[in-house]
Amino acid sequence: RICYIAPYDHKTCAAGENICYLKAWCDAWCSSRGKKLEFGCAATCPTVKPGVDISCCDTDNCNPHPKL
């Protein structure tokens, strides 16, 4: 699997990591900078805390930056 790890960078995931994910959450600067984003690979869709949005997918490069 190939997943984004930053808005313009992607990588080949480790063996067994077949899920791409994109986490989004607000911090103190959310109103001016927007949500913080975390991209990556995982074996399963990560569990998140309340207030954190996550989307998981299982095709190459399926976790792009939402505004690009």
Curated annotation (Swiss-Prot):
Primary residence: secreted
Domain of life (superkingdom): Eukaryota
Tissue specificity remark: Expressed by the venom gland.
InterPro entries to which the protein is assigned, alphabetical: Snake_3FTx (IPR003571), Snake_toxin-like_sf (IPR045860), Snake_toxin_con_site (IPR018354), Toxin_cobra-type (IPR054131)
Record-annotated disulphide pairs: 3-20, 13-41, 26-30, 45-56, 57-62
PROSITE patterns (alphabetical): SNAKE_TOXIN (PS00272)
UniProt cross-references to Gene3D superfamilies, sorted A to Z: CD59
Keywords from the named record: Acetylcholine receptor inhibiting toxin, Disulfide bond, Ion channel impairing toxin, Neurotoxin, Postsynaptic neurotoxin, Secreted, Toxin
GO molecular function ontology, one term from the record: ion channel regulator activity
GO cellular component terms given for this protein: extracellular region
Localization (cell): Secreted
Membership in a protein family: Belongs to the three-finger toxin family. Long-chain subfamily. Type II alpha-neurotoxin sub-subfamily.
Entry function: Binds with high affinity to muscular (alpha-1/CHRNA1) and neuronal (alpha-7/CHRNA7) nicotinic acetylcholine receptor (nAChR) and inhibits acetylcholine from binding to the receptor, thereby impairing neuromuscular and neuronal transmission.
Name of the protein this chain belongs to: Long neurotoxin 1
